[in-house]
Amino acid sequence: MADLRFDLAVIARELNGNSGKRVLDVGCGDGALMAALRDQSGIDARGIEINSELVEKCVSRGLSVVQGDADTDLADYPDKAFDYTVLCQTLPTSTRPDRILDELLRVGERAFVSFANFAHWRTRSALMFGGKMPVTQALPVSWYATQNIHHVTVEDFCALAKEKGARIERRWFFSGGREIGTPGANWRAEFAMFELSGGLN
């Protein structure tokens, strides 16, 4: 788990010992989380990834990954086909984050969702004092080149979860790649991750 990105490392830690559970990693990238879940916990991990080169990389590692678009292809999965769905740092790139959340909670019993927090104090400072869209560790790409089309804050996500009837089971906040406490997370956290259950579907 040491080589996993911080949010993926938390998921691997939390799911350790859940042998036989089924996990769908949406936007799975190079499959690092899936490989860790399979190798360390005996979890049946599947993935969806839009980038064909990353799909090939996953398949070469013996991972079960299909090329697909989270905005449309989650609809092909039956209700509660997985114990957990995972969407890490992909939500802001989706066309309709609200619909993606519906689908994650329809397809899985629970969902892990992580994202860069647009209300972090460095982001606020860049807008307030520089008058420009920020380029930070959490948002490293200039506005004209980023894949993010829907920036989100901790408070925005909590409001969306409530609107969707989802229950926030647990939450984690990160700054500098390390976990931080909950107080003041909307301005202190560079990244946030939530474990959700329920939903309207």
Which residue ranges define each predicted feature?
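A short SAM/SAH-binding and catalytic strip from SAM-dependent methyltransferases
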Residues: 84-95
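Conserved alpha-helix/loop element of class I SAM-dependent methyltransferases that forms part
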Residues: 3-19
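Class I SAM-dependent methyltransferase "Motif I" SAM/SAH-binding loop
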Residues: 27-29
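Glycine-rich SAM-binding Motif I of class I
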Residues: 31, 35
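Class I SAM-dependent methyltransferase SAM/SAH-binding core
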Residues: 36-73
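Short conserved loop adjoining the S-adenosyl-L-methionine
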Residues: 73-79
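S-adenosyl-L-methionine-dependent methyltransferase catalytic module, highlighting the catalytic core
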Residues: 99-103, 110-201
